[in-house]
From Swiss-Prot:
Disulfide bonds join C52-C66, C56-C77, C71-C82. The lineage of its organism: Eukaryota, Metazoa, Ecdysozoa, Arthropoda, Chelicerata. It is found in: Secreted. It comes from Cyriopagopus hainanus. It comes from the Eukaryota. Monomer. One of its GO terms (cellular component) is host cell postsynaptic membrane. Residues 1-22 form the signal peptide. Belongs to the neurotoxin 12 (Hwtx-2) family. 02 (Hwtx-2) subfamily. Residues 23-48 form a propeptide. Expressed by the venom gland. This is U4-theraphotoxin-Hhn1a.
């Protein structure tokens, strides 16, 4: 009797954990479909790094103080590059 009860409870616990994991995977897959693909995100990151460093180089060549270009959307300019805050 105890063995049967333990087996039923174990199966129920495994079923609950499996269902929860499946729901999390489904939610993650829906988020990935809605958002930008990783390649597009990488391109945006590269553009931001390039944009900030080039603007500082141009200002230095003009004999002006290098004013760091403001990065928007959770990014800040550090060491002539936009970095995620």
């Amino acid at each position: 009797m105890k063995a049967t009860l333990i087996a039923i409870l174990t199966c129920a616990a495994v079923l609950v954990l499996h269902t929860t994991a499946a729901e999390e995977l489904e939610a993650e897959s829906q988020l990935m479909e809605v958002g930008m693909p990783d390649t597009e995100l990488a391109a945006v990151d590269e553009e931001r790094l390039f944009e900030c460093s080039v603007s500082c180089e141009i200002e230095k060549e003009g004999n002006k103080d290098c004013k760091k270009k403001k990065c928007k959307g959770g990014w800040k300019c550090k060491f002539n590059m936009c970095v995620k805050v």
